[in-house]
């Protein structure tokens, strides 16, 4: 049994899930980020599955999404990379709030996400060594080059603030903790080549000892039951 509800964390509305009777107890905690044009509620099956496995799950709405969306779809579609950047800069306050409320057990804080959320997870891993482990599904850490083809910004300078979180020149920061990469080979939004590139770079540098990379044939840009199960297994093993 689990408990599922809405809480504000650092002023941001989140979906909050825990095993029943544990809402105010310290638990190993997963901060999980949703995809672009989606919301915390659409991805709530991750909260359910992970809470059933014993974790606290905190799923924020990204800027201009879910409870934070004002209905201006055209504006949102032009702000992909700026929204990703906002995910990065909001993390510190959310983490601090969770710790201040005594909700994270023994510094066991993980980050996961899918699509834009998977990009968020990889970027945060480069800057936050305190994160215990990371799961990135359908994501990429190569923001500065991916922006050439995925939601290219009208102003190329919009990508510049993402440099600090791009994985290209800091692979070692992805190698010192467990990392799960999952991607559907037939992904028609974020190419699976993004995950393959990262996995290959880690292997070639001898930095893959804690890497789990799973690629599913014939799967497009969607989360499968197998991907959900792999994510739960990963956090059960490493968080």
Spans of model-derived segments:
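N-terminal cap/lid segment of alpha/beta-hydrolase-fold proteins
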Residues: 1-25
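Short beta-strand element of the alpha/beta-hydrolase
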Residues: 25-35
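The serine-hydrolase catalytic nucleophile loop
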Residues: 36-48, 62
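Alpha/beta-hydrolase active-site loop
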Residues: 78-102
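Primarily recognizes the serine-hydrolase "nucleophile elbow" in alpha/beta-hydrolase
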Residues: 94-156
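C-terminal catalytic histidine-bearing segment of alpha/beta-hydrolase fold enzymes
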Residues: 205-239
């Amino acid at each position: 049994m689990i408990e599922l509800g809405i809480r504000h964390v650092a002023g941001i509305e989140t979906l909050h899930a825990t095993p029943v009777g544990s809402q105010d107890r310290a638990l190993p905690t997963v901060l999980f980020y949703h995809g672009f044009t989606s919301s915390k509620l659409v991805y709530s099956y991750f909260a359910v599955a992970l809470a059933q496995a014993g974790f606290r799950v905190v799923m924020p709405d990204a800027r201009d999404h879910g409870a934070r969306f004002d209905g201006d779809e055209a504006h949102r579609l032009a702000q992909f990379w700026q929204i990703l950047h906002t995910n990065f800069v909001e993390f510190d306050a959310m983490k601090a709030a969770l710790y201040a409320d005594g909700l994270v057990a023994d510094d066991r804080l993980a980050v996961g996400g899918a699509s834009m959320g998977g990009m968020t997870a990889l970027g945060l891993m480069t800057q936050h060594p305190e994160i215990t482990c990371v799961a990135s599904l359908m994501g990429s850490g190569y923001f500065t080059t991916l922006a050439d083809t995925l939601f290219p910004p009208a102003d190329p300078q919009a990508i510049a603030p993402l440099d600090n979180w791009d994985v290209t020149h800091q692979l070692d920061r992805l190698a010192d903790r467990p990392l799960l990469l999952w991607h559907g080979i037939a992904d028609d939004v974020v190419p699976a080549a993004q995950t393959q590139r990262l996995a290959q770079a880690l292997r070639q540098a001898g930095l893959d000892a804690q890497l789990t990379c799973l690629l599913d044939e014939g799967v497009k840009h969607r989360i499968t039951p197998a991907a959900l199960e792999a994510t739960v297994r990963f956090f059960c093993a490493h968080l």
